[in-house]
Amino acid sequence: RALATGAEIIIMLHPDYQYTPKLIHSIAYIIANGLYPVVCASRILGKGARKGGMPLIKYIANRFLTFFQNILLNQKLSEYHTGYRAFSAEVLRKINYHANSDDFVFDNEMLAQIFWHGYEIGEVTCPTKYFAEASSINFRRSCKYGLGVLRVSLQYRLARWGIIRPNIFQPQTNYKK
């Protein structure tokens, strides 16, 4: 909907109160000034994830998944699992996000699509807070998400090698301004 209203920068901020909205201006500035077309706020860069209360098991899973994604996607992000991201309208018009999952792995599919189309992703450090009222996915859905992340990353690598052609890596053809 943001694209339909003419937005040039679209910010996704999970509504679980774990991330500060105080970085919105800085993140938008990076995109508006052409430094990066996509920016992710990283809980890992500033080493604040554990200090902010991230459960140890989630931290370990984050590091494990990020390690394998960096290898399979041939990138060097500090994390792929943040709920705080910003995109230029150009990027969202290009990637085929309509082909993505309707679950938590959707966000991860978007990052793989962004890399597929040759865009770079910038990162800024972001403090986070984990507390009882903050929403978090349960263990079962976390496992499903983790397997989905590995699937997307493997699809990306196999597609780069020309072995498969998943729909999510095809250009968006149904964008209407």
What do the predicted segments below correspond to?
Residues 1-5, 9, 21-104, 131-140, ...:
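Acceptor/aglycone-binding surface of glycosyltransferases and processive sugar-polymer synthases
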Residues 26, 74, 98-177:
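Hydrophobic helical membrane-anchoring modules
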Residues 17-18:
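Acidic metal-phosphate-binding loop of nucleotide-sugar-dependent transferases
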